[in-house]
Design a protein with these regions (language model features):
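Residues lining hydrophobic/aromatic ligand-binding pockets adjacent to catalytic sites
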Residues: 1-122
C-alpha cells in the first residue's frame, strides 16, 4: 500500500505502475493531500480525515450514509463515481476487502464516526 501526499502522483502512469504490481493506493479524504480513488490492488484503504469534533458522530448522517455506500460499492467490486480518479480505466471487478480509517486533527469524535460507519455497512 502506498500513501502519496503530493499531487504530482496524480497521473495515469503512476496508477498504471501501481496496478502492474497490484499495489493499493490510499484514498485520502483530506484538505491537503491528493484524493485518489483509483482501485490499484486487491483491497481498498480509505483514510477519512475530514471529521468534525463538533459533530457527535464525527460526520453528519448524510455523509456517513454516502461513505457507507462507497465502502460497500468498493467491497462488492465496484467503484464510486463521485470520488476523483486519475485514470478513467476501471479496475478489475470482483469482491475486495475494504479498510476505512476514521481520523482527523482533534480525534475526539473519530471513534464514534467509525462505529457509525460499522453500523451502516453491516
Amino acid at each position: 500500500m502506498v500513501e502519496v501526499r503530493n499531487p504530482s502522483f496524480c497521473v495515469p502512469d503512476f496508477i498504471a505502475l501501481l496496478r502492474k504490481f497490484e499495489t493499493p493506493v490510499v484514498f485520502a479524504e483530506h484538505g491537503t493531500y491528493p484524493a485518489i480513488a483509483d482501485v490499484t490492488g486487491d483491497f481498498v484503504y480509505a483514510r477519512l480525515q475530514k471529521g468534525n469534533d463538533e459533530i457527535k458522530t464525527c460526520y453528519p448522517p448524510k455523509q456517513l450514509d454516502a461513505w457507507a455506500k462507497r465502502l460497500q460499492l468498493w467491497a462488492g467490486g465496484g467503484e464510486p463515481d463521485d470520488l476523483p480518479r486519475v485514470d478513467p480505466a476501471k479496475a478489475k471487478k470482483g469482491p475486495r476487502d475494504v479498510f476505512a480509517y476514521v481520523i482527523h486533527e482533534g480525534k475526539v469524535r473519530a471513534p464514534a464516526g467509525a462505529m457509525e460507519l460499522i453500523q451502516r455497512v453491516t
